[in-house]
Design a protein with these regions (language model features):
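Conserved acidic residues
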Residues: 35, 84
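Polybasic/polar functional segments that serve as interface/processing modules
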Residues: 1-34, 43-78, 92-94, 101-130
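Active-site beta-strand termini and strand-to-loop segments that position acidic
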Residues: 80-82
Length: 130
C-alpha cells in the first residue's frame, strides 16, 4: 500500500475516535526501519486504547499488516507498529514528558483533512451593540 494512502487511513482512524493533536512526521532520514511517525493524544485510558484499536481495525480492513501493538495494559502510551509507519497514542501528560516531537525532529507532513460538514439549522441570534 502507498505510504500516503496508509498515512491518510491512520489519521482518519484516529480522528474517527476523536484523537487530538494528530501530527505526522517524515523520519525517513532519521530511521531506516520506518518512514513516518504519527503521534496523537487521548484523554483517558479507554480512549487511548480505542484510538489504537481504531488504527488496527482500519489497517486490517485495508489489507495492511499490523506488526504489533504495545502498551495496551497500561494505556498511558500505546504504540502500533505498521512497518513503515509507527503510531504513538498517548495521554497528554505522557506526551509532554516524553516529547517525541522534539526527539524525532523530522519534517512534519502536511495532509488534507476532510472538510467538516456544514451545520444546518438555526444560527445563533446576533448580539446587539450598545
Amino acid at each position: 500500500m502507498d505510504i500516503r494512502k496508509k498515512q491518510r487511513a491512520v489519521v482518519a482512524a484516529l480522528e474517527d475516535v476523536k484523537g487530538r493533536e494528530v501530527v505526522v512526521y517524515n523520519v525517513a532520514r532519521h530511521a531506516s526501519i520506518f518512514e513516518r511517525v504519527v503521534i496523537a493524544s487521548g484523554d483517558s485510558n479507554r480512549q487511548v486504547n480505542a484510538l489504537a484499536a481504531s488504527v488496527q481495525q482500519r489497517m486490517k480492513a485495508l489489507g495492511a499488516r499490523v506488526y504489533g501493538v504495545e502498551g495496551r495494559r497500561n494505556a498511558d502510551w500505546v504504540l502500533v507498529d505498521l512497518g513503515d509507519i509507527v503510531v504513538h497514542v498517548m495521554h497528554p501528560a505522557a506526551r509532554s514528558y516524553y516529547n517525541l516531537e522534539e526527539l524525532w525532529g523530522g519534517k512534519e507532513v502536511s495532509f488534507k483533512r476532510p472538510a467538516a460538514a456544514p451545520v444546518r439549522g438555526k444560527t445563533a441570534p446576533r448580539r446587539r451593540r450598545k
